[in-house]
């Protein structure tokens, strides 16, 4: 038999060791002018031209064939990193890597000028996974709990998301974390009888608490708090 069984505990380790020699060392010996990043079996090669990209793609396919491997044709593509002063027409101008989508985005420089930048932000797939994780939180058992107890339970997860996805274009992650505040609003409406039919009042109550305890939840400390009441 060939290969490592899917789901094997040692599978990722063996695959990583194999690719270290099949790909990493081969690239350094034969194509040291092309930088690359590899995480498990996901790899990016940085090329200076379409000609170079097509050349290295052919070389990698040949190398893999020699080692009884093949590329995933659906995921393998040449991407044009379009940004200011790079306006050559090309069909593929974005890609996903390790939970991020890299694509052209409008940015503002230190002088307030708008320019086109090729940069990462949390991918749609990663946003969906976070949303699903939040939806799967069993908030029913939160009802007898205080906010401090809920914070202790979910803060490690939220902080992990912020640490990983919040470094680039954090606005998009903040939109996803709105669902955390929504779950807290649901908790408040279930816990306090006077708020069960008053969603806006519950939001304001949480917003007022966030002003008093801005570091209670990881995303509040990050600056994404519920809206406080007008008196605040």
Predicted regions and their residues:
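Non-catalytic terminal/accessory segments
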Residues: 1-232
